[in-house]
Amino acid sequence: MAHKKGASSSRNGRDSNAQRLGVKRFGGQTVKAGEILVRQRGTHFHPGVNVGRGGDDTLFALAAGAVQFGTKRGRKTVNIVAPAPVQA
């Protein structure tokens, strides 16, 4: 095994792919059941009403409605509420 670098070789050049974490649907947006709301590592946001949590702590909508962010007992939560009626 060579311990000197050969011609035009490098020991650098490796990096991991980005995980694309973060909020995917923001407050007030309407969503359908099954849509991903937040991708996260750990529970930065906790699931609220009509929101489920996946094995990797991803939050997703359990029902159609509007996204609402809030707090409960000092924890950030994400809820799905009935969409506001449209004014004609």
Swiss-Prot record:
Gene Ontology CC entries for this record: cytosolic large ribosomal subunit
UniProt xrefs under InterPro entries: Ribosomal_bL27 (IPR001684), Ribosomal_bL27_CS (IPR018261)
One Pfam family per UniProt: Ribosomal_L27
GO terms classed as biological process: translation
Residue ranges with Polar residues bias: 7-19
Region named Disordered: 1-25
Keywords recorded for this protein, A-Z: Ribonucleoprotein, Ribosomal protein
Superkingdom of the source species: Bacteria
Gene Ontology molecular function terms on file: structural constituent of ribosome
Listed NCBIfam families: L27
Family: Belongs to the bacterial ribosomal protein bL27 family.
The protein's name: Large ribosomal subunit protein bL27
Native species: Nocardia farcinica (strain IFM 10152)
Upper lineage: Bacteria, Bacillati, Actinomycetota, Actinomycetes, Mycobacteriales
Primary gene name: rpmA
